[in-house]
């Protein structure tokens, strides 16, 4: 494995696996959140400043293995050009004859974007022949796509085999690994994890893993109601996973045995329907009337969580506190985001990861006020769980 910081790119074509799987406007197909594109720019610029040229490859969405306009990476061109400050080239088929002509003719300082890798079904199958064809676009390989590092696809894992002495992580992937390692391996205390989102079932592994590391575990979002019901609370028609009530009890027992403080909401904003125009009330979380559902944490919970966050030296946040997409139920998530930003100012290392909490800090304009916002939802969770990620292992081999 080489290091991007010391590698000599002069006269070389760098094949970079980026993660440009960005949301697009359904009508105009314009990029609506360019976080992932912005995050890849430092790696691209490093190659160009070192006298090399760049071939970018990525997937976008879940096409049915055939070209579709709504999944075309041409929709990202103007955004990439905006951040690079010059025009780039585009190849309409990542392994078409024209694509190879274009990549072979690249001059130092030039950038070529290949069309969506998933327009070929061989990408997700991790096909070796497909990976070998892709490898012909570059003299060295850089993986900078943390968002797909947990997938053993042709462009994320197999292609690395064809660059045994010329493969490396990009700056973004390096930073992602460093940030998670810092949370998992640092001896700074207290370490607080904030876990939200809808379902306990999707977070069991991560919570179990975190109980070995954290001092405090704050639980919010839809999953909190499963914990409250497991303790005998009345939660009305709030989201509850009936088949995971015992799981919640087990988690609380293990936390107690390990000396971890679990903090659950004590009050909630509840509504008579899942709508921004619903009737709303505020009350104790274990006393929600029948026919009503909890959709956000309320004042007292915010204050309790805030105090713990501000006293922490390391903070991991994964998952919102309520239905933050609706204005009436976003205050809990907004206030927790503000507290995490404030803790960062006080010197805490703060890592935000997982689709919805990332969307929240972006929506509230606080992404630049935390230490690191992870671009890899599933990949970050799997890495935190201690799973070996194929995209990372392929570079380290």
Feature roles, as predicted:
Residues 1-397:
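Active-site loop-to-helix "anion-binding N-cap" substructures in soluble metabolic enzymes
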């Amino acid at each position: 494995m080489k290091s991007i910081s010391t590698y000599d790119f002069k006269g070389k074509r760098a094949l970079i696996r980026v993660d440009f799987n960005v949301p697009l406007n359904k009508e105009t197909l314009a990029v609506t959140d360019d976080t992932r594109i912005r995050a890849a720019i430092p790696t691209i610029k490093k190659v160009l400043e070192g006298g090399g040229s760049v071939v970018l490859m990525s997937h976008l969405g879940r096409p049915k293995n055939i070209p579709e306009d709504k999944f075309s990476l041409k929709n990202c061109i103007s955004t990439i050009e905006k951040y690079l400050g010059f025009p780039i080239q585009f190849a309409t088929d990542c392994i078409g004859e024209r694509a190879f002509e274009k990549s072979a003719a690249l001059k130092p300082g030039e950038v070529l974007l290949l069309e969506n890798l998933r327009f070929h079904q061989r990408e997700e199958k991790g096909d070796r022949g497909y990976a070998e064809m892709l490898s012909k676009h570059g003299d060295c390989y850089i993986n900078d796509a943390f968002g797909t590092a947990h997938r053993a696809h042709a462009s994320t894992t197999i292609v690395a085999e064809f660059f045994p002495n010329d493969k490396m992580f990009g700056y973004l992937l390096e930073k992602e690994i460093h940030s998670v390692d810092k949370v998992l391996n640092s001896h700074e205390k207290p370490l607080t994890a904030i876990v939200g989102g809808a379902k306990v079932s999707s977070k069991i592994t991560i919570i179990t893993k975190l109980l070995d590391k954290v001092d405090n575990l704050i639980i919010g979002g839809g999953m909190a109601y499963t914990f409250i019901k497991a303790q005998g609370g009345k939660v009305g028609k709030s989201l509850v996973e009936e088949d995971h009530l015992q799981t919640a009890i087990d988690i609380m027992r293990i936390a107690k045995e390990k000396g971890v403080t679990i903090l659950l909401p004590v009050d909630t904003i509840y509504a008579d329907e899942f709508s921004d125009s619903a009737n709303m009330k505020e009350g104790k979380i274990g006393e929600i009337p029948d026919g009503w559902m909890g959709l956000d944490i309320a004042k007292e919970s915010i204050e309790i969580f805030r105090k713990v966050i501000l006293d922490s030296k390391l903070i991991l946040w994964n998952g919102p506190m309520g239905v933050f997409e609706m204005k009436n139920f976003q205050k809990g998530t907004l206030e927790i985001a503000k507290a995490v930003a404030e803790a960062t100012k006080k010197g805490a290392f703060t890592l935000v990861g997982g689709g919805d909490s990332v969307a929240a800090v972006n929506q509230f304009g606080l992404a630049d006020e935390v230490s690191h916002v992870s671009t890899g939802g599933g990949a970050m969770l799997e890495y935190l769980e201690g799973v070996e990620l194929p995209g990372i292992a392929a570079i380290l081999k």
